[in-house]
Every structure is written in C-alpha cells, then in structure tokens.
Amino acid sequence: MDYKTLVPVMRRLALEAGAKIMEIYEADDFDVQVKSDNSPVTAADEAADALISAGLRAAFPDMALVTEEQADTHGTGAMTFLIVDPLDGTKEFIHRRGDFTVNIALVEDGVPTRGVVYAPAKGRMFFTQADGQTVEEAGPFEMGTTGTVTPLKVKAPDNSALMVVASKSHRDQATDDYINKYNVKDMASAGSSLKFCLVATGEADIYPRVGRTMEWDTAAGHAVLKGAGGDVVRFDDHSPLTYGKDGFANPFFIAYAPGVELKPA
C-alpha cells in the first residue's frame, strides 16, 4: 500500500463524511432505526457510509473493504483490508453529546497501521501520517490541504497517579472494578474512538474496555494510539489485540501508554 496516497484519501473522506453527518446532526429531527443486533442506526450513519465506501472503492479498487453498515463486507477473510465505522458513537450522536467520530483505518496482516479519527462536532482530527507518526491537525480543516499538525506522543505515566478514560455510554460495574485496581488521580469519560485519542495526546494514561466492541469501532483509534507510541492488548492475557477475526468481534481490551503497570483481569 502506498501510504502517501492512502492517508490524504482517508483524511478527505473523513472530512466529507463529517460534513454530511453534521448536516443531519444540526437538523431539527432525524429518524433512528434499530438494527438486528439492537444497536441504533441513523440516516447519518448510512449517508457517511455510502460516501466513504464509494470513495475508498474508487481510490483502491483492489483492496478489501469492511464497513459496519454493509453486512456483505463482513466475510472478506482477508488479513489486509480497509475498515470503516462511518459514525462511531451513534448514541452520542442521537443524544447530541458531540462525542462521535468518523473512523477509517488500514489493517495489514492483522495490525492497524494507518488510521484517521475525526470528531466533527468537537473539531478534532487525528491521523497517522504516511511515515506512521500520529498527528493532531488544527482546524479549520480544508478538504485538499492539510493544515498545521502537532506530532503526538503518549506521556510517561505516573503509576501512583494515573489518568483513566472510560466509556461515556457503556460504563459498568466490571469496568469500575478493574479501574479500582489502579491508583487513579482522575477520571475522564468520552464516547467513541476519542478515548484512544486521549491516551495518544497524553490526556489519559489508560483506557480499559470491559464490554462488547467490534473491529470497526477500534481499528482507527488503535492505529492513532500506536502511531503515538501507545499499545492495545487483550484484557485476559495482555497479548496484542489483532484484527481480521472471524465475525470481527473484539475481546475485552486495554489501551494504554507504555509504562503503565497493567493489572491482571
């Protein structure tokens, strides 16, 4: 894959999808449907998915594509593929909380290597450059031109005073029980892939996820964190979280800055 070609395409499509999502977000009302797995879906999910998938297929016709909203893409069997969640954090979108993102990533041999996470309501854009370094771009954003970027690097954690970020919509007792194993200075809650990005920027040290996620929920954020020097491991045995799994369901996981002394499950 030519990363110098890929990254600008992913960034542009994320911006275009974000603009479409915000049109619907700022409308007086929008319909919410329920999918077969009981998760919500809106016109914004579908419009963003159509835009991104068409753009990726046009630019990279020979690359396998997996996208949340198209079930016929879920049987690819490939270990190298593009993966999309056109609107991650649909519940945040529905409740107009702003913590939703557009996620686009490249997975190579089971590892997310390049990704973009764009939070249009927050005006925050994170992506991995062609060289693999993660940056945050300052707005306002232009489709064809990348603005000022700041390279990101996870911070060195203080295990006696950790900053923890957890899910805004999916927090439960199991998550709290695990967090309580650490010496926590402060807690933050965030929706969607923004949790990975907060670890990447140094705003948090660790993000444990003790709950259901799919690969399209995590691949872009995983790539962003990886490009900032962070890591994502399985909750049960702390082995690397891999992609291309049958059904695309993730095990529980921990995203963290190296130096955090991980506790057993």
Feature roles, as predicted:
Residues M1-L87, Q173, D177-K181, C197, ...:
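N-terminal subdomain of lithium-sensitive/metallo-dependent phosphomonoesterases centered on the IMPase/IPPase/PAP
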Residues M1-R12, G18, D177-K181, F196-A265:
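Oxyanion/phosphate-interacting regions
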Residues I21, D45, L56, T90, ...:
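Residue-level signal for inorganic ion chemistry
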Residues F30-V32, V41, L65, T134, ...:
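Short clusters of hydrophobic/aromatic residues that line enzyme substrate/ligand-binding pockets
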Residues V66, K185-S189, V233:
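General small-molecule cofactor/ligand-binding pocket signal
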Residues T67, A166, R209-V210:
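Thr-Gly-centered strand-to-loop micro-motif
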Residues A78-V117:
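Glycine-rich active-site/cofactor-binding loop and its immediate structural neighborhood
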Residues A105-F196, G244-A265:
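Acidic beta-strand-loop-alpha-helix segment within the catalytic core
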